[in-house]
Amino acid sequence: MKKGIHPELKPTTFVCGCGNTFTLLSTKGGTVYLEVCNQCHPFYAGKLKIKPAYYEMLAEFEGGKKEE
């Protein structure tokens, strides 16, 4: 790699609203505040609720429409 053309990476602390914190390398540096992370997002935390309309559409799709 060429020297002097790549940005400097600094340790950056990411703080979530749920209290989870983690540190990564980033060009920004300092602290970044997040609304959600993998610990509190419903999809990753297993709290995602699928609405009944989804099941209705799925049943219609799997059953197929009868053409007359």
UniProtKB/Swiss-Prot annotation:
Keywords: Metal-binding, Ribonucleoprotein, Ribosomal protein, RNA-binding, rRNA-binding, Zinc
One BP term from GO: translation
Cofactor note as given: Binds 1 zinc ion per subunit.
Protein origin, superkingdom: Bacteria
Molecular function per GO: metal ion binding; rRNA binding; structural constituent of ribosome
Name by which UniProt lists this protein: Large ribosomal subunit protein bL31
Homology family: Belongs to the bacterial ribosomal protein bL31 family. Type A subfamily.
NCBIfam families: L31 (TIGR00105)
Cofactor: Zn(2+)
Oligomeric and partner information: Part of the 50S ribosomal subunit.
Gene3D superfamilies, alphabetized: 4.10.80.400
One GO CC term, this protein: ribosome
Organism annotation: Aquifex aeolicus (strain VF5)
Residues annotated as binding Zn(2+): 16, 18, 37, 40
A Pfam family that the UniProt record links to this protein: Ribosomal_L31
Function: Binds the 23S rRNA.
